[in-house]
Every structure is written in C-alpha cells, then in structure tokens.
C-alpha cells in the first residue's frame, strides 16, 4: 500500500520545485523573445504554462490525500542570456529530476490517481530532456547561428 505521507511530501517537493521551474521558464521566455527569438520565447512560455498545470494537479492531489499544501521558499535559480548555456542547464535539471521522479512514481504505484499524475509528468519531463538533447545535437551539426535563425 502506498505511504500517503511520503507521497504527499514528494508531491510538495514537485509543487515547490516545479513552480520555480515554471517561473524560470517564463523568465527565459521573455529574455529569448526580447533577443528576437520569438519561437524559442513561445516554446518556453508554453512550457511554463504546462508546468503550472502540473503544479495545480499536485496541489489538488495533496489536498485529496488530506495533506497540507505549503508555499515554500524557492531556491535562487540562474537566469541566462546565452541560449546554449540555458539549454544545458535545463537539460541537467530534467536529468536530475527524472531519477528522483521515477522513485516517487514507483512509491505511488498502488495509488492509481497519484501514479497517473506522476507518470504523465515523468513522460513530459522525459520529452523535455530529449528535446534539449536534440537541440544541442542540432546546434553542433548546423551551427549556432543557423539554429538561432530558425528560432526567429
């Protein structure tokens, strides 16, 4: 049987960390759009909105499980003007998250509702990781300037 306390704690970590990631993606969206890379700006704006949706689902699930949602302080996160540095940073965040998230998803296997939420979030985070890896490979193949031209 799933350990609700451990699951609630895990969901709270997601709420706190993912809210910060959503804010970070929103900030990066504005920075890239201001640099003239509207497609990249739109991608990260959409990503921020998607992450906020997962935050909402996790908050709802904490409440459904009888937990108390906390509005915890968020760690300071870097802001980048260099696209490559940002993608590398974001890729590492995804990689770090996936190992931990896999364990939490396994912990929730008997709580089908939480399991489904975590599985969906895991799949989304995995797609983000693959996208970042593909973009870095593409930049290496066609060059940064050519890649940036596609982001206008």
Would you name each region that the model predicts?
Residues 1-152:
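Iron-associated oxidoreductase/ferritin-like identity signal
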